[in-house]
Amino acid sequence: MGNPNGFYVLKFNDAELIPEFIPFPSSADGTNRLRIMLDPPMALSELNGIHRGTLQAGTKLVVNLFDGGIRDSVRASIDGGEEILLNYRVRIDPFIKNLYEKFAKTDDAYPTPDRSSHIWELMMPDNLAAGLHHIVVKSTDEFGQYQRATFTFELESNLATNF
């Protein structure tokens, strides 16, 4: 679980086969092949704000590399710093878990989330200063295919440093 609807393009080079997953543009992630989020989500300062607020203690950067697996690698750079290799984990995708909780007991309820085998995590630094922060995530799959995505958020303060 954790892949949006999509299809595969199969590339052949003599006897070599390279599959490439393409998400349908109608999904929540459009045609992105990576979903980047914070878990737990930021404590938002405004109900209609997007990625502006405070980090909670133990916040992780979580990346879902759609159709990824243990033979792939995911790296992240925070604010132009050195690239850090993320840890591969089999776990429930927090994005799907949030949708499940949001729509529970409604006509649009989601099925109970299952663990995803294409999740990578990185513990967020607990010393990030207030202000804008930019994360660049890069992945390389087992076939050498490369993906790049970004995530920007604004810290008004950092609750993680208050513990």
Task: Identify the meaning behind each predicted range.
Residues 38-39, 91-92, 103-105, 163:
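Short, surface-exposed, polar/charged, turn-prone segments marking secondary-structure boundaries
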Residues 1-68, 72-75, 123-129, 134-154:
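Binuclear metal-dependent phosphoesterase catalytic core
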Residues 152-163:
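Flexible, low-complexity linkers/stalks enriched in Thr/Pro that connect modular domains
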Residues 84-90:
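Short, solvent-exposed beta-strand-terminating loops
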Residues 42-44, 97, 108, 158-159:
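Short, intrinsically disordered/low-complexity patches at protein termini
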Residues 93-123:
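Aromatic sugar-binding surface patches on proteins
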